Amino acid sequence: MSSDVLVTTPAQRQTEPHAEAVSRNRRQQATFRKVLAAAMATLREKSYADLTVRLVAARAKVAPATAYTYFSSKNHLIAEVYLDLVRQVPCVTDVNVPMPIRVTSSLRHLALVVADEPEIGAACTAALLDGGADPAVRAVRDRIGAEIHRRITSAIGPGADPGTVFALEMAFFGALVQAGSGTFTYHEIADRLGYVVGLILAGANEPSTGGSE
């Protein structure tokens, strides 16, 4: 008997388009990653001002139109580079480590993602600040904020106080702006963040003085 499939079952009809979609998504993801890697390599050689999506596309060996399919602008591309770096930072959740140390360690790791490549850090800061009017950049900023929020709440643990988390987020992003502008190095802000984290967490643990006398 021939092994050729002459009739496609309903299950096969449902599976085959799904398989095509999965394959297509994998190809798209591979292209996305390739352009991101090319952007990182280009930023090591070119300044923020000199980088263009076309230049990165040429390095990634993809058509400019393909690169623009994934990244609407230079700022969008660089913002995605920073988001990718943030996502590589592990969550610090070891319950055997005191909570303040977990939080400090988490923010320190996040602060140092571009510490050894200040030109990339400066480009990321410029893209995130200058691209505020770009909806694609705003969306990436929101995702970066969500990643930072998740790591802070994970480090604090169950029942993290929203006000404390917000204060830590504000301290972290303020520190990044100072490093990106060159006021401090990334290593310096990482050290200073440890002190600020201590103050915020100590204040959060102080008993409230409110209430009637």
From Swiss-Prot:
Region (Disordered): 1-26
Disulfide bonds: none
Domain HTH tetR-type: start-end pairs: 29-89
Xref: InterPro entries: DNA-bd_HTH_TetR-type_CS, Homeodomain-like_sf, HTH-type_TetR-like_transc_reg, HTH_TetR
Sorted UniProt keywords: DNA-binding, Repeat, Transcription, Transcription regulation
Single GO MF descriptor: DNA-binding transcription factor activity
GO biological process: regulation of DNA-templated transcription
Polar residues: bias regions: 1-14
PANTHER family in the record: HTH-TYPE TRANSCRIPTIONAL REGULATOR BETI, HTH-TYPE TRANSCRIPTIONAL REGULATOR RUTR
Protein name (database record): Uncharacterized HTH-type transcriptional regulator Rv0767c
Organism: Mycobacterium tuberculosis (strain ATCC 25618 / H37Rv)
